[in-house]
Design a protein with these regions (language model features):
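Sec-dependent N-terminal signal peptides
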Residues: 2-12
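Structured catalytic-domain cores with a bias toward divalent-metal coordination
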Residues: 11-344
Length: 344
């Protein structure tokens, strides 16, 4: 297994306490607390985290939930994973960000921070002197991503979305090992639909996305998706919890035989279809549905029923997610079409 050579080298190193901000976990212990995001040009916040330090050396895996405030299934799953992982049986370290975007979570806002109006997953690696979303990204980059060997950014359907389970794995062509291991951890998580991402930014100073920030630092990373309408439904909570435990067994961080890697369908060409206006959205397709080029995805009307736009598929493919809710702003997504490929 590709992770084993590194792990074998780590086994010769004595395990020591692991500190993230004010949180320190000694070998065989878990510890939780908050990373502070100081006030700056706007109000500050804090980030709830857990450090699980294994009794034996091994890799460090970062698990991030709550980047978007209403994507709650991963948040609940990480709470359960915190209790399920026995530090005495763990090799290595697990870093959990329980809710990356606490302002958005507490205000139940979709996509954007209620403080600065920015999408946290579009401002990485962040800035220490920026607005609150940028400062959150800076803290997560420096305290979590830079400390990890692997990363999973855990997303689900936001309050307006229906998302079939799938993962994004980068293939940026900068480091073959990182590209390959990113696909491997998507499979280890249990994903059977994987979008091969080839168009992310290559500049570490403008990485934009959580996953891409790790990838550009040569840390294998994926974005895990799946869920609907901001619900912590049991199926998606279990999907995420199972993914965590599968990955840790695959990396030999938890005892037990690793699960077989599943067969997967890969997608490369994708397009997010965006609304040309603001009004009431009437979708005509569902997530997972196959569509032909030019087929109707839905109709946007004005507030008095006048048709503003008929949105169509730009090419044939599969709907990876759709927005089934009526409220629609100009420039927001109505869905994403992806084309299956034979091999990554």
């Amino acid at each position: 297994m590709t992770a084993l050579p590194m792990l074998c080298a780590l086994l010769t190193v004595q395990q020591t306490p692991f500190t993230v901000g004010p949180v320190t976990a000694r070998p065989g212990e878990r510890a939780s607390g908050y990373l502070g995001v100081p006030a700056g040009v706007d109000s500050g916040t804090r980030i709830p985290i857990t450090v699980i330090r294994g009794a034996r050396p091994g890799p460090t895996v970062a698990l991030i939930a709550g980047t978007h405030g209403v994507e709650v299934a991963p948040i609940v799953a990480l709470q359960r994973a915190r209790a399920a992982i026995d530090p005495a049986a763990l090799a290595g370290t697990v870093l959990m960000v329980h809710v990356a975007n606490l302002p958005s979570y507490l205000r139940r806002t979709v996509y954007y921070s209620p403080i600065d109006g920015k999408n946290l997953n579009r401002v990485y690696p962040g800035r220490p002197d920026g607005t609150v979303s940028e400062r959150i990204a800076h803290v997560i980059t420096t305290e979590i991503i830079d400390r990890a060997d692997y990363l999973v950014d855990m997303h689900s359907g936001d309050g307006n979305e229906m998302v079939r389970p799938y993962a994004y794995a980068g293939r940026l062509g900068l480091d073959a090992r990182t590209d390959s291991l990113s696909r491997e951890i998507a499979l280890a998580w249990g994903h059977t639909r994987i979008v091969i991402d080839t168009e992310r930014p290559r500049d570490p100073a403008a990485s934009v996305y959580t996953q891409n920030t790790a990838h550009l630092r040569r840390k294998p990373a994926i974005t895990s998706e799946g869920g609907y309408l901001g619900l912590a439904d049991e199926e998606m909570v279990q999907h995420n919890l199972t993914g965590v435990l599968r990955l840790l067994r695959h990396l030999r961080m938890l005892p037990g035989a690793p699960d077989p890697l599943p067969a997967a369908v890969y997608f490369e060409r994708t397009e997010v279809v965006r609304s040309p206006g603001t009004g009431i959205w009437y979708p005509a397709v569902a997530e997972g549905q196959a569509v032909a080029a030019g087929s109707v995805l839905g109709v946007l009307t004005g507030f008095f029923g006048d048709t503003l736009a008929v949105l169509r598929a730009p090419f044939g493919g599969v709907m990876m997610y759709v927005v089934p809710t009526p409220a629609m702003n100009q420039g927001e997504p109505v869905g994403m079409v992806a084309v299956p490929i034979l091999a990554p």
